[in-house]
Amino acid sequence: MIINPTTSDPEVSALEKKNTGRIAQIIGPVLDVTFPPGKMPNIYNALIVKGRDTVGQQINVTCEVQQLLGNNRVRAVAMSATDGLTRGMEVIDTGAALSVPVGGVTLGRIFNVLGEPIDNLGPVDTRTTSPIHRSAPAFIQLDTKLSIFETGIKVVDLLAPYRRGGKIGLFGGAGVGKTVLIMELINNIAKAHGGVSVFGGVGERTREGNDLYMEMKESGVINEKNIAESKVALVYGQMNEPPGARMRVGLTALTMAEYFRDVNEQDVLLFIDNIFRFVQAGSEVSALLGRMPSAVGYQPTLSTEMGSLQERITSTKEGSITSIQAVYVPADDLTDPAPATTFAHLDATTVLSRGLAAKGIYPAVDPLDSTSTMLQPRIVGEEHYETAQRVKQTLQRYKELQDIIAILGLDELSEEDRLTVARARKIERFLSQPFFVAEVFTGSPGKYVGLAETIRGFKLILSGELDSLPEQAFYLVGNIDEATVKATNLEKESKLKK
């Protein structure tokens, strides 16, 4: 990992000694800059435009070199608005790629694509920075063991387990619990694995970014009183920003995560919301640079851009980055090049269901639609695999019987099917779980359930040992022993009412 133990402040006098050019052309967020012969900047170098606009306001725009055009000209993409720029303005070549602050100083703070804090909580120590462009770890550095990343969330660990150092796609509409699930994962990795999280808000709504920050403060994921004890760093490049910022903000978040993995040797969770916006921004930049579009108007370099981001997200012998990426599917078309390219990199998918959310079953993870490449006997073991398959079969049979139940009622089913339905309803409720971060809303203390406990619980339900317990005893509990205690309490309450 390349660490620059220097300041990333563009104001330093060192910049004045760098070679300078002049703006020759401005096309929206794209600038053409002329440099003296023999002093051309490299691809991905950061350029800084300084000066004043026509009203006298200070201008400070950072750009990134994308193309060398010949005739001493380069084409660069701006990372912020180009309002007020004029031809002939001086441009300074920093001589290096964009660098952002890394390490513990980033926790509890919100940054933009340039690594500048945007939360009005004062400056950040920038003595340790790292460039956002770097190659993926070499094969020799990779950890080849296939191991499960235990989240403490029953439905995830049992039916669609996450791979340590893997990539997970998170699918779900508005209001089905994506944010709460993300916050619970951030909380659990900090408590159970001693890890930290980095959240990359790529091209989403500013309001959602603000809501997430407020909810994190409310739930304790960000500690306002002692920022250093926070469990997450936030990097935002929202949809009102130029395409250059949206295209690079994912790399800024990833660079911060890589430091925690490579230098601090921690397990890191990297959230990207939304990976589709990363592709969309790349498409906009590609068009502005004059490249010929590919299928459906996307950039011809789509697979390369996606690969350069995704291949850096991996496990090394030092630590791991496990990435959870929200995936927007345009017009619900899974064959669209953007989601199709993303799917090639995913190890698991977590699908949130509006139907389950409507029933009040949270987390509303669809047990039949969610998948994982880790759910194989040689990886998770025979017991886990068999239990997961039997749970899925029971839920699938219940789904098939629902139409018959709706038309004819439960009484028309065979004895065997009625037993299947009863167990499936218990399983469905036992897949719900109280979250630590939702304590402030529900009043129920959160529960972290280990994988062994999860498997034991579902095996007991499937074996029929708990057929006598009421189904509401399984709703919003941690392990199976809590369900048994809840059933006893419910029985006592019903006797008292009588």
Swiss-Prot record:
Catalysed reaction equations from the record: ATP + H2O + 4 H(+)(in) = ADP + phosphate + 5 H(+)(out)
Role according to the record: Produces ATP from ADP in the presence of a proton gradient across the membrane. The catalytic sites are hosted primarily by the beta subunits.
Keywords: ATP synthesis, ATP-binding, CF(1), Chloroplast, Hydrogen ion transport, Ion transport, Membrane, Nucleotide-binding, Plastid, Thylakoid, Translocase, Transport
Identification of the protein by name: ATP synthase subunit beta, chloroplastic
HAMAP family in alphabetical order: ATP_synth_beta_bact (MF_01347)
Stored Pfam families: ATP-synt_ab, ATP-synt_ab_N, ATP-synt_VA_C
GO molecular function, one term: ATP binding
GO terms for cellular component: chloroplast thylakoid membrane; mitochondrion; proton-transporting ATP synthase complex
EC number: 7.1.2.2
Location in the cell: Plastid, Chloroplast thylakoid membrane
Gene Ontology annotations of biological process type: proton motive force-driven mitochondrial ATP synthesis
Main location: plastid
Superkingdom to which the source organism belongs: Eukaryota
UniProt membrane topology term: Peripheral membrane protein
Chain positions recorded as ATP binding sites: G172, G173, A174, G175, V176, G177, K178, T179
Coiled-coil region list: none
Subunit structure: F-type ATPases have 2 components, CF(1) - the catalytic core - and CF(0) - the membrane proton channel. CF(1) has five subunits: alpha(3), beta(3), gamma(1), delta(1), epsilon(1). CF(0) has four main subunits: a(1), b(1), b'(1) and c(9-12).
Homology family: Belongs to the ATPase alpha/beta chains family.
